């Protein structure tokens, strides 16, 4: 809430106008109760002797989500022996600074997971989140169809993992609607990420306000190279390729340190079936 107040002071716009429409019952009972969001979700596959991490491709027909294609995509992932899992980075809201991640390397490394769900529902939600993060031509119709499909899938998929990924979809949907000024005509169950709202309010770094404010509020240099070690050398030696679409949600993948730890995760961390397993 304090970040919301700071944003209101910077922009001169009351807090209420920044908040998306929510129903009181949904606001009182959020999908996931903590300010942590799953980010940088990529599908990881093994191809010959290489690992490939790539975004879920956009599946659309007449501007809407192609549900039949999505079902087949999920089935193929669950049945493929070459599918390794999804990369998932767990970030607290204020740590996601749009173009920077406000975490030291040793902490960020622990936040990167390789999730290999066995449930079709969780797999589908991960695909939808990856698709949402990497969608370059966002439209109200497509955004609405993603959130509607995700909610239906979440309703029949119990567990904390489904709730957590659904929270990410709700949050990024609200954020995309705010950033791109899309009229989705729906009640969101999460609020836009505050740092993304601040990024939009401040404006481009070439403007006087952006040039002054962005280094203060939206830059962090914690995630920098700390020197090469044996894991780094092994990461460079093993072929791991990362593919993604350039959107406001994937700016972190331009950071070499982020890429390094994602690759290390795919190489050295065993896949887990749940982010909440003990």
UniProtKB/Swiss-Prot annotation:
Has UniProt tagged this entry with the keyword Cytoplasm? no
Give the record's GO CC terms.
Answer: host cell Golgi apparatus; viral tegument
Superkingdom classification of source: Viruses
Question: Looking at the Swiss-Prot or TrEMBL record, what is one Pfam family this protein matches?
Answer: Herpes_UL7
- Name the UniProt key words of this record, in alphabetical order: Host cytoplasm, Host Golgi apparatus, Virion, Virion tegument
Compartments it resides in: Virion; Virion tegument; Host cytoplasm; Host Golgi apparatus
Q: Does the keyword Cell inner membrane apply?
A: no
Q: What does this protein do?
A: Plays a critical role in cytoplasmic virus egress. Participates in the final step of tegumentation and envelope acquisition within the host cytoplasm.
Give the family per the record. Answer: Belongs to the herpesviridae cytoplasmic envelopment protein 1 family.
Q: Tell me the protein's name.
A: Cytoplasmic envelopment protein 1
Species of origin reads Human herpesvirus 8 type P (isolate GK18) (HHV-8)
Q: Which gene encodes it?
A: ORF42
């Amino acid at each position: 809430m304090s970040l919301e107040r700071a944003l209101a002071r910077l922009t001169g716009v009351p807090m209420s106008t920044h908040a998306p429409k929510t129903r009181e019952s949904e606001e009182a009972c959020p999908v996931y109760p903590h300010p942590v969001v799953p980010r940088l979700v990529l599908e990881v596959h093994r191809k010959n002797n290489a690992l490939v991490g790539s975004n879920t491709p956009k599946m659309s027909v007449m501007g809407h989500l192609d549900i039949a294609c999505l079902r087949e995509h999920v089935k193929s992932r669950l049945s493929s022996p070459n599918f390794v899992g999804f990369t998932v980075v767990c970030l607290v809201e204020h740590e996601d600074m749009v173009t920077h991640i406000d975490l030291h390397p040793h902490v960020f490394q622990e936040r990167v997971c390789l999730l290999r769900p066995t449930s079709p529902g969780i797999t589908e939600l991960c695909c939808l989140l990856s698709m949402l993060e990497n969608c370059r031509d966002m439209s109200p119709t497509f955004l609405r169809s993603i959130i509607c499909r995700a909610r239906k899938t979440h309703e029949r998929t119990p567990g904390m993992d489904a709730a957590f990924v659904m929270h990410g979809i709700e949050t990024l949907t609200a954020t995309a609607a705010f950033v791109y000024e899309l009229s989705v005509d729906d009640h969101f169950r999460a609020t836009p990420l505050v740092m993304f709202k601040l990024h939009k309010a401040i404006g481009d770094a070439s403007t006087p306000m952006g040039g002054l404010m962005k280094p203060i509020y939206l830059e962090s240099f914690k995630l920098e190279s700390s020197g090469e070690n044996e894991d780094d050398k092994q990461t460079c030696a093993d072929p791991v390729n990362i593919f993604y679409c350039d959107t406001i949600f994937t700016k972190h993948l331009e950071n070499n340190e982020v890429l390094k730890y994602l690759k290390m995760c795919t190489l050295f961390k065993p896949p887990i079936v749940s982010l909440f397993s003990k």
